[in-house]
Regions:
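Acidic/histidine-rich catalytic cores and adjacent linkers
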Residues: 2-32, 38, 42-156
Length: 156
C-alpha cells in the first residue's frame, strides 16, 4: 500500500545492530538483547530449525527413522506452554534421542529467562548473559557458538 501511495509508514520497529564482537558481553549488549528480544529469538529459532534439518539429513543418510524428529521439528523452537498436549510426547522423545537439540532447547529457555527476571540487577543479568555465552561457546555445538558470537556483537 505504501508503494502506491495509499499509506505512509510512521514508525518502524528497530533492527538489531551488530558491531564488533566483544570479548565478553557487557551491559550495552544486554540492553540490545532486551530491546531486540523478538528478533534475537527468531534468529535462535532459525538456528534450531537448521540444526534439526541437519540432524534429519544425517539420519536419512544412515537410513534411520526420522518420523519422530520430523513431527517434533515444528515445536522444538517454541515455548513449552505453547506446545499442544498431543505433541508433548513426540517432543520429549526427540529431545531424549538427540542431545544436541535438547541442549539447544534448554539454552533457549535459559536465554529467555534473562529478560523475564526483572527482579535481578543489571550487573547480575550481565553476569548471567556472560555465563550463557560462555556455556554456548563451550557446548561443542556450532550453531550455539555462532549465535553466541553474534550475540556478543549486538549493540543498542
Amino acid at each position: 500500500m505504501q508503494t502506491v501511495g495509499w499509506a505512509k509508514v510512521k514508525k518502524v520497529a528497530p533492527r538489531l545492530q551488530l558491531g564488533d564482537v566483544k570479548p565478553v558481553a557487557d551491559e550495552k549488549t544486554l540492553e540490545a538483547l532486551i530491546a531486540n528480544r523478538y528478533e534475537v529469538m527468531a534468529g535462535y529459532a532459525r538456528g534450531v530449525r537448521q540444526a534439526c534439518k541437519d540432524e534429519i539429513a544425517t539420519l536419512q543418510a544412515r537410513q534411520a527413522d526420522v518420523s519422530v524428529l520430523r513431527a517434533a521439528k515444528r515445536w522444538l523452537h517454541r515455548d513449552a506452554d505453547k506446545v499442544p498436549a498431543q505433541a508433548q510426547p513426540q517432543l520429549a522423545q526427540a529431545r531424549a534421542a538427540h542431545p544436541a537439540l535438547d541442549k539447544m532447547v534448554t539454552m533457549r529457555e535459559e536465554l529467555r529467562q534473562l529478560w523475564l527476571n526483572t527482579s535481578q540487577s543489571r550487573e547480575q543479568l550481565t553476569a548471567d548473559l556472560q555465563a550463557w555465552c560462555h556455556r554456548a561457546e563451550e557446548s561443542g555445538i556450532a550453531a550455539l557458538r555462532e549465535f553466541s558470537i553474534r550475540l556478543r556483537a549486538a549493540r543498542a
